């Protein structure tokens, strides 16, 4: 097969001609799986971080006719400047059209000729030229009514044109007001106040590897019936040799259990359990560094004020997924309310105890899980929060030298020694949602 025959993007190319580099990962100590990895240029995003789809239409037959057939949707979808320009031109065209008609009527009736007597009544009073006819057209359609120019009973066609212009003016006004109101009430801009974390993370949750990302609502108004979904997009070659450039695979975020429906009052971490049905089941940390895929995440719901459905989108490339990280807490309890600190929304911290193997190898017990009592960032934050509460109460006598209260020091020693699981106690802050 020659290089020219492989110019087709759907043809199968060899590794040498495509510029791919082979890297073999060792399987020792759980840091590899013995697979052959390839490093290649990352493909373009299908969905940008701001939610826009990275697509361009080409070679569309009868595109203009199809768009004009759905004029209302076209006016709602286009930019404000173009919509206002279209309506301004529509008003100007209607004024000019009927101005020309009234001028022609005046010419045909002889109203522009010098009057020899006072016995003839003109079709339109005080219309002696085109400019006067144009002004009469504007006064008729906008119902200004200065009182100088008016139609008479002399010409039936002039009366009919006044009625026709009034109807046309009402149609243009109604169409313009409807399009502007529909454009203003669209929930598209509501997605600007729905936030996705910059990165997704992979970490252990209840003994299982999970893919997690965070969503938040920057407004106090709620998103009714909010629910999330996700898809993995990557190229694939079928068993028959067919090349699918963007194969879409659903990622389960708890649809069967109802976990995909969320109460988005505070930032929430969305969780996808990497199990046998997950497309990420066989991907390890090394695979993640070399693989080429995109995870599209979607948040949908109804705007509380208008009950219209809105949708926010984002995506994560493989190099934007942090293996062995967790999100920092953003929800803290202070006095009689909860405080959300969005400065920590995108921040993560590393969990070194996260296994680097795939979930498949983890299920097959090839690698040991870290201790359930491992001391982590949330525990440290809880201890510090408890100390701050004790300090606010003025109880400083029983503190140890390192700044921890005796109870916090006791729990810390138990965690470090692996002596058991802490009993549940309410904390002032530091609880992640």
Swiss-Prot record:
UniProt effect for mutating residue 169 to R: Found in a patient with hypokalemic periodic paralysis without hyperthyroidism; reduces potassium inward and outward currents density
Primary location class: membrane
Induction, per UniProt: Up-regulated by triiodothyronine.
Membrane disposition: Multi-pass membrane protein
Region of interest (Disordered), residue spans: 387-433
Basic and acidic residues: bias regions: 396-414
MF terms in GO: inward rectifier potassium channel activity
Extracellular side: 105-129, 147-155
UniProt motif (Selectivity filter) ranges: 143-148
Gene3D superfamilies: 1.10.287.70, G protein-activated inward rectifier potassium channel 1
Cytoplasmic face residues: 1-77, 184-433
Catalytic activity: K(+)(in) = K(+)(out)
GO cellular component annotations of the record: endoplasmic reticulum; monoatomic ion channel complex; plasma membrane
Keywords: Cell membrane, Disease variant, Endoplasmic reticulum, Ion channel, Ion transport, Membrane, Phosphoprotein, Potassium, Potassium transport, Transmembrane, Transmembrane helix, Transport, Voltage-gated channel
Tissue note: Specifically expressed in skeletal muscle.
Localization terms from the record: Cell membrane; Endoplasmic reticulum
Intramembrane region list: 130-146
Pfam assignment, any one: IRK_C
Effect of residue 156 to P: Increased expression at the cell membrane
Transmembrane segments annotated in the record for this chain: 78-104, 156-183
Disorder association: Thyrotoxic periodic paralysis 2: A sporadic muscular disorder characterized by episodic weakness and hypokalemia during a thyrotoxic state. It is clinically similar to hereditary hypokalemic periodic paralysis, except for the fact that hyperthyroidism is an absolute requirement for disease manifestation. The disease presents with recurrent episodes of acute muscular weakness of the four extremities that vary in severity from paresis to complete paralysis. Attacks are triggered by ingestion of a high carbohydrate load or strenuous physical activity followed by a period of rest.
Subunit structure: Can form heteromeric channels with Kir2.1/KCNJ2. Can form heteromeric channels with Kir2.2/KCNJ12.
Family affiliation: Belongs to the inward rectifier-type potassium channel (TC 1.A.2.1) family. KCNJ12 subfamily.
Function: Inward rectifier potassium channels are characterized by a greater tendency to allow potassium to flow into the cell rather than out of it. Their voltage dependence is regulated by the concentration of extracellular potassium; as external potassium is raised, the voltage range of the channel opening shifts to more positive voltages. The inward rectification is mainly due to the blockage of outward current by internal magnesium.
Name of the molecule in the record: Inward rectifier potassium channel 18
Gene coding for it: KCNJ18
């Amino acid at each position: 097969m020659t290089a020219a025959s492989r110019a087709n993007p759907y043809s199968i190319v060899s590794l040498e001609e495509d510029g791919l580099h082979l890297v073999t990962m060792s399987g020792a100590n759980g840091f590899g799986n013995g697979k052959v990895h390839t490093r290649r240029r990352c493909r373009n995003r299908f969905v940008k971080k701001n939610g826009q789809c990275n697509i361009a239409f080409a070679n569309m037959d009868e595109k203009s006719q199809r768009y004009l057939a759905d004029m209302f949707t076209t006016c709602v979808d286009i930019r404000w400047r173009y919509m206002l320009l279209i309506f301004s031109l529509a008003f100007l065209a209607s004024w000019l059209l009927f101005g020309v008609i009234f001028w022609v009527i005046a010419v045909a009736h002889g109203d522009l000729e010098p009057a020899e007597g006072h016995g003839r009544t003109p079709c339109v009073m005080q219309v002696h030229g085109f400019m006067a006819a144009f002004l009469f057209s504007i006064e008729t359609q906008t119902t200004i009514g200065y009182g100088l120019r008016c139609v008479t009973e002399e010409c039936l066609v002039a009366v009919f044109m006044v009625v026709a212009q009034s109807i046309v003016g009402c149609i243009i006004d109604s169409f313009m007001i409807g399009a502007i109101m529909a454009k203003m009430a669209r929930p598209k801009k509501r997605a600007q106040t729905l936030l996705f974390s910059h990165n997704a993370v992979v970490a252990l949750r209840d003994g299982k590897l999970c893919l997690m990302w965070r969503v938040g609502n920057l407004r106090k108004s709620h998103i009714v019936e909010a629910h999330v979904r996700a898809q993995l997009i990557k190229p694939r070659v079928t068993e028959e040799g067919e090349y699918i450039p963007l194969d879409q695979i659903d990622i389960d975020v708890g649809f069967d259990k109802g976990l995909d429906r969320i109460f988005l009052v505070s930032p929430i971490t969305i969780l996808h359990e990497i199990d046998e049905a997950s497309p990420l089941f066989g991907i390890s940390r090394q695979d993640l560094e070399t693989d080429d895929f995109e995870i599209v995440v979607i948040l949908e719901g109804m705007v509380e004020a208008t009950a219209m459905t809105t949708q926010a989108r984002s995506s994560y490339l493989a190099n934007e997924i942090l293996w062995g990280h967790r999100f920092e807490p953003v929800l803290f309890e202070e006095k009689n309310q909860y405080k959300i600190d969005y400065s920590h929304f995108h921040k993560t911290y590393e969990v070194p105890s996260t296994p680097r193997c795939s979930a498949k190898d983890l299920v097959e017990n090839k690698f040991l899980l870290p201790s359930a009592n491992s001391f982590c960032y949330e525990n440290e934050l809880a201890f510090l929060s408890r100390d701050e509460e004790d300090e606010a109460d003025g109880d400083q006598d029983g503190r140890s030298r390192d700044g921890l209260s005796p109870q916090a020091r006791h729990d810390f020693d138990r965690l470090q020694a692996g002596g058991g699981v802490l009993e549940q106690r309410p904390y002032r802050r530091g609880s992640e949602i």
